[in-house]
């Protein structure tokens, strides 16, 4: 039994990008017709993996290298629908945003700046709540405040909510 899953296709795209990124060629061709029909949206997942692998945090590099790689998809099967292309784009933008936050040095992305950046996500439809030290004291969040006492910067807790899922979907929460 074939147990090929969407994440396998994403990983395949990432592996492909890793191999071609340092090659001499800058143009590649991929046939969607060679992918067996049971792997719906194969090309979408494959290109998504390539895009995720292409991420680089080079915000502070003085010499930024730019390399254009052209991927030409031809054929009529397994192409991503416009709706799926939007889904992949949103996933990529969210992933890159998180990677940017994680990669920022602590002297740049301090608690104040972190809260400010996450507050800007309200424009994307997220409900963002920012709890400063005064609110945290009121909530009895003494352990969090205790950790923050070692810093000259204030402590913050930020919660974000996305209510765009179907009504019957189970809630999903991340804590970190």
Locate each region found by the language model:
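Short amphipathic alpha-helical segment within the helicase RecA-like ATPase core
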Residues: 1-175
């Amino acid at each position: 039994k074939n147990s090929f899953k969407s994440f396998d296709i994403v990983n395949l795209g990432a592996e492909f990008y890793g191999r071609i990124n340092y090659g001499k060629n800058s143009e590649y061709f991929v046939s969607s017709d060679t992918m067996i029909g049971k792997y719906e949206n194969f090309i979408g997942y494959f290109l998504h993996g390539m895009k995720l692998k292409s991420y680089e945090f080079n915000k502070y590099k003085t010499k930024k290298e730019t390399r254009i790689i052209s991927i030409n998809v031809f054929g009529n099967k397994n192409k991503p629908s416009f709706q799926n292309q939007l889904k992949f784009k949103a996933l990529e933008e969210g992933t890159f945003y998180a990677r940017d936050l994680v990669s920022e040095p602590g002297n740049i992305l301090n608690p104040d700046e972190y809260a400010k950046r996450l507050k800007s996500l309200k424009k994307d439809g997220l409900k963002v709540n920012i709890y400063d030290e005064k609110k945290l004291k009121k909530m009895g969040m003494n352990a969090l405040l205790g950790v923050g006492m070692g810093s000259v910067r204030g402590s913050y807790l930020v919660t974000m909510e996305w209510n765009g899922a179907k009504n019957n979907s189970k809630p999903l929460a991340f804590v970190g």
